[in-house]
């Protein structure tokens, strides 16, 4: 078996983002475009990366003009390295606060299960499965 790298997973994730995996809220506001494909994908992308590497899920607040505009999710690996595959979605001067580690929700990540499952399956297909499985 050929080992997977973070670059392999990053490329597979980015190639798998689409309107049908975007957060419905971001999609309804017209925030998602093919020019900004990571928009509305931070939560489920962090879960998919966690599927491959484990570690911790990180969450921070998103602020613009001094007002909170939601939350942002990324990963911290067991080594302590933090990886954020969707940070580039913030193009309007948004600021993400320092994150805090949270436990992965048990079971289905409602209400985004369908989008998570679709993204996860696309990534897994592009990579030929999960390592060691």
Where does each model-flagged region fall?
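A structural boundary/capping signal
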Residues: 1-133
């Amino acid at each position: 078996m050929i080992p997977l790298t973070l670059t392999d997973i990053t490329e597979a994730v980015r190639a798998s983002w689409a309107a049908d995996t975007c957060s419905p809220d971001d999609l309804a506001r017209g925030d998602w475009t093919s020019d900004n494909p990571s928009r509305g994908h931070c939560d489920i992308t962090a879960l998919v990366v966690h599927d491959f590497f484990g570690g911790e899920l990180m969450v921070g607040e998103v602020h613009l003009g001094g007002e909170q505009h939601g939350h942002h999710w990324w990963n911290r690996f067991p080594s302590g390295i933090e990886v954020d595959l969707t940070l580039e979605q913030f193009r309007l001067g948004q600021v993400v606060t320092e994150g805090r580690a949270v436990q992965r929700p048990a079971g289905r990540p409602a209400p985004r299960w369908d989008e998570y499952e679709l993204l996860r399956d696309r990534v897994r297909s592009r990579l030929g499965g999960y390592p060691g499985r």
